[in-house]
C-alpha cells in the first residue's frame, strides 16, 4: 500500500470514548456523536476515529477508541453534553494512506497499511494512537473514503 510520511499538528478533539469490540463501538460512538453534533449545532472541522490498542494484543472487550470531531483550540464543551470528552491527538510524524472502505470492512485496509509499514527501512511504528479521518459521509454514499494515520519514528541505528 502506498503511503507518505508527514508532520501533523495536534488536533483538538471532542466526542465519545468507547470500550469494546470496535465493529460495535465505533458505529455506536458515531451514532452518539452525530446526535450530539446535530443537537448542539457543533461545526466539526473533521470526523475522526482514534484507536488506542493493538487488536492482536488486546481482547476485543477491552479495545479503546474515541469517536470524535476535531474542533478549534478555543472550543468549550456545551452544557448538557453528557459523556463528551475533550482531548487531543498528538502532533508528530505520521504515515498516511488513503483507502475506500466498502461493506463496513475497515480492517482490510488497516492490515494492508500495517503490513506495508512493517517493511519500511527508515521508519517504525511509534507507541501512540492511530486514527482515521473520514473524507465523506459513508452512510449516505454507501462507502467510506478514509485517510489512515499511523504515528512513526525513525528506526534506531
From Swiss-Prot:
SMART domains: AraC_E_bind. It is found in: Cytoplasm. Keywords: Cytoplasm, Stress response. GO terms for cellular component: cytoplasm. One of its GO terms (molecular function) is DNA topoisomerase type II (double strand cut, ATP-hydrolyzing) inhibitor activity. HAMAP family: DNA_gyrase_inhibitor. Interacts with DNA gyrase. Inhibits the supercoiling activity of DNA gyrase. Acts by inhibiting DNA gyrase at an early step, prior to (or at the step of) binding of DNA by the gyrase. It protects cells against toxins that target DNA gyrase, by inhibiting activity of these toxins and reducing the formation of lethal double-strand breaks in the cell. Belongs to the DNA gyrase inhibitor family. This is DNA gyrase inhibitor. The gene is sbmC.
